[in-house]
């Protein structure tokens, strides 16, 4: 039964724990006066600045300002959650954790999540068994160079073309359709029919850092678009918080000196197969703040691997922008850029383990990449150009929380632009600098803008839609434009963006559509269809809610006729499913 740990027990546990003894089993402490010192485990340093005070049962680092009690230390050093830290201390002292029962609502949520974890595990096992029963799927994996040990290690699976075929093969268990929809296995279309989201795909189970399977990735066996899909957001799966391969890495390499980040599931598996056992993936998306935090709690050095083309450089720049605010002293971000038309899977099979390790060794430090990128098109003989680029560089460097790292970067920048005293840059007060060098100020994201942008950039999406005539009478800003765009895309099959845009030339909407046509919405190609349909579903929900409110108001004022009552009942029933 889930429970709350009493505060009294936590206080007692801290009281009974000698912080010196616990830390000394992990770090060599040396007594200096009343305190104990060692090199800080959370940043690189030559002179020990990590101090532990016996009287205060507290640690503090003068270099990176990290501090806390023994629970904080275990959470940061061992990458444990708060509850896991309490359990670890209780285990050390041989104590049983007393529990306070929580309320019924929290109990229900706990049991619900526990059941979903169990369901995803069972489904993953079902998929895994099925891959060995489906010859063409099994051969596909082997032909990709992935051996049987990796299939088992990553628990790879296969979902057949029809979910019910899978159930027939495994007659022991019949699964509840509603629960399968909750974890994103089954999906219901706008027209109301249900199908297997991952049908005819290789399955990659996604685990959280505790080993629970929280979602799935799926790779098509043919050229079906999209090539890769992920589970949707659910109660247990939040894409921006998960990293593929993290759990598997921590099992064999709990304290990696560095972590290599690649884009694809197969890239992770290939590199691990070639003994690069510190490789994980961001599920095919741009890195999030939460993922960066998790990575830096696990290792001091993160290496991102990208294609060497323009899109790879742009992705690396976006990653750098997100990473800067997490680079404390002792932490580092590096980049590897592969040759064009190569990915980690293909190149390690061509070059082998040793040559790929050389690429890792030659990875570019974030500071070098930052300045190289900014000054790539800057004329260093032009004072105005140097000044403009420097203001952008200064504002970026100031995002870095590590003061020592920040100082070194200011020194490097000052030498590059010919300023002898780097303190001039540090003391220069620069505000409101636009640091985006690849993109202009982003367009404000609204659901209707997203679907219009996706459609204008991918006209084929219109062919995936059912009839939308029932939406024509509703008034939502941008809806009429979207419906007109759908009509034009359907009337021009196999058309491209330029062709569709041309239909709007000399119309008031043309400029807006042109902006959306080049809008970097940062949605990966394999996710576009699902994202588009999900966004359209949100719009339909907004329309239903708006109509519901109008009918309720009308009912209170003048009453409803039989047809309107039935409409309200239907809307209430539909929205109750959400």
Swiss-Prot record:
InterPro entries: DNA_helicase_N/primase_C (IPR016136), DNA_primase_core_N_sf (IPR037068), DNA_primase_DnaB-bd (IPR019475), DNA_primase_DnaG (IPR006295), DNA_primase_DnaG_DnaB-bd_dom (IPR013173), DNA_primase_Znf_CHC2 (IPR036977), DnaG_bac (IPR030846), DNAG_N (IPR013264). SUPFAM superfamilies: DNA primase core (SSF56731), DNA primase DnaG, C-terminal domain (SSF117023), Zinc beta-ribbon (SSF57783). Keywords: DNA replication, DNA-binding, DNA-directed RNA polymerase, Magnesium, Metal-binding, Nucleotidyltransferase, Primosome, Transcription, Transferase, Zinc, Zinc-finger. SMART domains: DnaG_DnaB_bind, TOPRIM, ZnF_CHCC. Signal peptide: none annotated. One of its GO terms (biological process) is DNA replication, synthesis of primer. GO terms for cellular component: cytoplasm; DNA-directed RNA polymerase complex; primosome complex. Mg(2+) 1 binds at residues 263, 307. Gene3D superfamilies: 3.40.1360.10, DNA primase, catalytic core, N-terminal domain, DNAb Helicase, Chain A, DnaG, RNA polymerase domain, helical bundle, Zinc finger, CHC2-type domain. Contains an N-terminal zinc-binding domain, a central core domain that contains the primase activity, and a C-terminal DnaB-binding domain. Belongs to the DnaG primase family. Monomer. Interacts with DnaB. This is DNA primase. It comes from Buchnera aphidicola subsp. Baizongia pistaciae (strain Bp).
């Amino acid at each position: 039964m889930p429970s709350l740990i009493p505060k009294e027990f936590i206080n007692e546990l801290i009281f009974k724990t000698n912080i010196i003894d616990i830390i000394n089993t992990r770090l060599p402490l040396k007594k200096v006066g009343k305190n104990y010192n060692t090199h800080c485990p959370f940043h690189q340093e030559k002179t020990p600045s990590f101090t532990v005070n016996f009287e205060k049962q507290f640690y503090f680092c003068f270099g990176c300002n990290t501090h806390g009690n023994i629970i904080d230390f275990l959470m940061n050093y061992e990458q444990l959650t708060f509850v896991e830290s309490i359990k670890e201390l209780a285990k050390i002292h041989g104590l049983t954790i007393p529990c306070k029962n929580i309320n019924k609502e929290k109990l229900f949520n706990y049991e619900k999540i526990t059941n979903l974890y169990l369901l995803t595990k069972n489904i993953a096992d079902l998929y895994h068994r099925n891959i060995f029963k489906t010859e063409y799927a099994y051969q596909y994996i082997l032909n990709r160079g992935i051996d049987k040990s990796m299939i088992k290690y990553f628990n790879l699976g296969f979902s057949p073309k029809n979910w019910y075929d899978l159930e027939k093969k495994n007659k022991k268990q019949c699964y509840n359709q509603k629960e399968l929809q909750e974890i994103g296995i089954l999906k219901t279309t706008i027209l109301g029919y249900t199908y297997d989201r991952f049908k005819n795909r290789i399955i990659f189970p996604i685990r959280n850092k505790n080993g629970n399977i929280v979602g799935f990735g799926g790779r098509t066996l043919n050229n079906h678009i999209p090539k890769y899909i992920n589970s949707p957001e659910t109660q247990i799966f939040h894409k921006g918080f998960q990293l593929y391969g993290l759990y598997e890495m921590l099992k064999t390499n709990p304290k990696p000196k560095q972590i290599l980040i690649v884009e694809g599931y197969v890239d992770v598996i290939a590199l691990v197969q070639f003994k690069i056992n510190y490789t994980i993936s961001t599920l095919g998306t741009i890195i999030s703040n939460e993922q960066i935090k998790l990575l830096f709690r696990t290792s001091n050095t993160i290496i991102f691997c990208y294609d060497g083309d323009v899109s790879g450089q742009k992705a690396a720049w976006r990653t750098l922008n997100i990473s800067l605010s997490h680079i404390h002293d002792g932490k580092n971000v590096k980049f590897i850029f592969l040759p064009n038309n190569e990915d980690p899977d293909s190149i390690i099979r061509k070059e082998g383990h040793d040559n790929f390790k050389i690429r890792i060794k030659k990875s570019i430090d974030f500071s070098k990449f930052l300045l190289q990128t900014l000054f790539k098109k800057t004329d260093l003989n032009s004072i105005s150009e140097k000044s403009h680029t420097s203001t952008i560089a200064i504002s970026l460097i100031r995002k870095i929380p590590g003061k020592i790292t920040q100082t070194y970067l200011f020194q490097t920048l000052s030498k590059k632009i010919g300023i002898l005293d780097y303190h001039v840059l540090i003391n220069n007060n620069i505000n409101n600098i636009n640091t985006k060098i690849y993109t202009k100020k982003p367009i404000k994201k609204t659901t209707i803008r997203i679907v219009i942008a996706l459609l204008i950039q991918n006209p084929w999406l219109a062919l995936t839609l059912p009839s939308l005539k029932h939406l024509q009478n509703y008034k939502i800003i941008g809806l009429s434009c979207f419906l007109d765009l759908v009509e034009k895309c359907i009337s021009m099959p196999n058309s491209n963006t330029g062709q569709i845009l041309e239909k709007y030339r000399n119309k008031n909407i043309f400029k807006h559509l042109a902006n959306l046509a080049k809008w970097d919405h940062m949605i990966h190609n394999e996710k576009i269809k699902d994202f588009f349909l999900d966004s359209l579903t949100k719009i339909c929900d907004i329309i239903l809610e708006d109509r519901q409110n109008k009918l309720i108001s009308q009912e209170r004022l003048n009453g409803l006729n039989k047809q309107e009552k039935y409409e309200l009942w239907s809307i209430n029933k539909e929205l109750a499913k959400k």
